[in-house]
Amino acid sequence: MKPQLIAFKKFLQTEFQAVDFETFRINFNLCLKREQDNIVIYEDDDYDDQPFFFKPMLSDGFFIQTEVIKQLDYLAKVVENPKDSDQQCCQNFYEALIVFISALAITKGINPNRFHQRLVNRFAIHAVY
């Protein structure tokens, strides 16, 4: 896996493990609802086709907390393309986690815009928030 992508994934996993999960879950579900209010969803869209980070976190806390770490690993593997640069892989990873990153920032008590900017500066990605 590309070094910059590994560093980005580990950074998010470490930040996630440092926050109170129940507070994070509430913030994530609120951010997701706000985001979903801005997306067009069709009747024939299948819920199972939605990525993990575009579904509300509703079930057992321990299960979801463990699943988030697994899904971050999985997503990093999915977005890694040998033909893409490190920066492009990180950009794809970032764009798939906009809601997750915003909820993480809110849970940490940081302005989401500042947190996104911090990621832009640290991992050389382009903010889309």
Curated annotation (Swiss-Prot):
Source organism, top-level taxon: Bacteria
Gene3D superfamilies for the chain: mg296 homolog like, mpn423 like domain
Coiled coil start-end: none
InterPro entries xref list: Mg296-like_C (IPR027371), MG296-like_sf (IPR036340), Mg296_protein (IPR019097)
One Pfam family of this chain: Mg296
Protein's name according to its UniProt entry: Uncharacterized protein MG296
